[in-house]
Amino acid sequence: MAALICFLLAGMILRFPGTTISASQTALSIWAQDIVPSLFPYMVLCKMTAQRLRSTRFPAAPLAALLGCMGGSPSGAAMLSVSSGGMAQSQLYALCALTGTISPMFFVGTLHAWGVAQKTCLCLLAAHGLGALLSFACVWQLSPAKGKVAMLETPEKANGNPIADSVFSVLGVGGCIVFFSVTAACIRVLFPFLPENGCAYLQSVLEIAGGMRLLIQTSGASFARDVSMAVLTGFGGLSILTQNHLFLQVCGVTQGRLLCLALLRALMSGAVMALLLWLI
């Protein structure tokens, strides 16, 4: 099935090269102008911090949680891929729920640069973090404590050059943004009757950065839009799930498991955002 979808997508790219090029240019512009300036220096700092803490034999689980919450995806997933050996599966799944987040700089930096009010950005960041924490607690309590995760990666892979590793991580983010932006553009060609808001939500499910920018451009500030943004960023988009799975597949974490955790995180983030907006 996946191969068939890839062939169909390749056919559409060849059939509509103008649409593909335009979507790629837009995605690369978002990545280069809005994502890299905020994400890259922050990711370097997070990796340097993690390296320092790792050298002091800081416990693996708290370190993965700290790095994931500080740096967002795929930093936490990368850390889990090299430090999950010996963890209980319930602990690994709970940490996947906690660390499958978006960088805090996306909320206070990128979204604010796109015109979202600072107060709303801070509420979105709070809802995102609390939603991940609530998801962590739920998974920790409800997941059966089965076996332990085998060590499938060597810790040396986590001890590279922080700057070089960050470059490749940011390039991976850019590749996923472009791929899923092109996918969203091809779907819009197939269904031209979709309204602009519908296209924004669709693209957000596939690729969060471009989708959020389109949603901000096509809708004004409102309770419904802000809660929707919390839900969508809590989910993270298939782009982020793909990036995380590239690291976590060596731990035996399936895409279906990551999808379920993302849906739980989206539900929690949306509920917290609605509560915050109601309180303030």
Language model features by range: what are they?
Residues 39-59:
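Juxtamembrane transmembrane-helix boundary signature
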Residues 4-40, 44, 122-194, 271:
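Selected transmembrane alpha-helices and immediately adjacent juxtamembrane segments
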Residues 26, 30, 123-124, 199-204, ...:
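Pore-lining and gate-forming transmembrane alpha-helices of multi-pass membrane transport proteins
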Residues 86-140, 248-271:
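Membrane-core helix-loop-helix motifs of multi-pass transport proteins
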Residues 272-280:
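Juxtamembrane boundary at the C-terminal end of a transmembrane helix
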Residues 7-8, 34-40, 100-104, 155, ...:
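Small-residue-rich segments of transmembrane alpha-helices in multi-pass membrane proteins
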Residues 163-233:
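Transmembrane helical segments that form the transport core of multi-pass membrane transport proteins
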Residues 58-115, 202-218, 225-249:
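Alpha-helical membrane segments and immediately flanking helix-loop junctions
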